[in-house]
């Protein structure tokens, strides 16, 4: 599916989402599988715990060049995220909220980020700009922050309206 989407010119995103149990504590096998997938990926999401699987944060620019990645998003939990795009990197701070349950926060962030790119009209990697990435990062950040304020993985996922209500309120 990744290869086909990539060949069709679609934006292909990938979240490593490493789980020890799933890989029987074999992080090396997971890293090998990730490296086999990367030629078909445009936007990669990795966490602090996963960054060593792709050579470490200090080598992300090289990884992007070798694998022709459009963007890499490194999530750093409650502290926010760092984006690598177009030869630059920048951070977005995490939102200070009262967390009830962190289950699904990364998925909420990633879903918010990707949906924002689509809502902004990005259908191909060439459509993506720094302002679009910045807006998508904020959208994802709000989504993740809303998620952790409720219990449950699925039931805590915010709606588009909830996210956009915060954006409108903060724009005033």
Regions found by a protein language model. Give the residues of each.
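Conserved phosphate-binding/catalytic region of the ribokinase-like
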Residues: 3-7, 56-172
């Amino acid at each position: 599916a990744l290869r086909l989407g990539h060949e069709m010119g679609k934006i292909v995103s990938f979240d490593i989402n490493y789980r020890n149990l799933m890989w029987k504590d074999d992080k090396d096998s997971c890293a090998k599988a990730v490296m086999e997938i990367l030629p078909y990926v445009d936007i990669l999401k990795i966490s602090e715990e996963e960054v060593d699987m792709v050579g470490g944060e200090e080598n992300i620019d090289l990884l992007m060049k070798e694998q022709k990645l459009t963007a890499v998003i490194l999530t750093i939990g409650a502290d926010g995220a760092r984006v690598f795009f177009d030869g630059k990197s920048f951070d977005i701070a995490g939102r200070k909220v009262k967390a009830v349950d962190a289950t699904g926060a990364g998925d909420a962030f990633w879903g918010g980020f990707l949906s924002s790119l689509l809502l902004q009209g990005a259908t191909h990697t060439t459509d993506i700009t720094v302002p679009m990435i910045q807006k998508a990062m904020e959208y994802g950040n709000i989504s993740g922050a809303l998620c952790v304020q409720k219990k449950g993985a699925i039931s805590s996922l915010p709606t588009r309206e909830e996210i956009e209500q915060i954006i409108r309120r903060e724009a005033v």
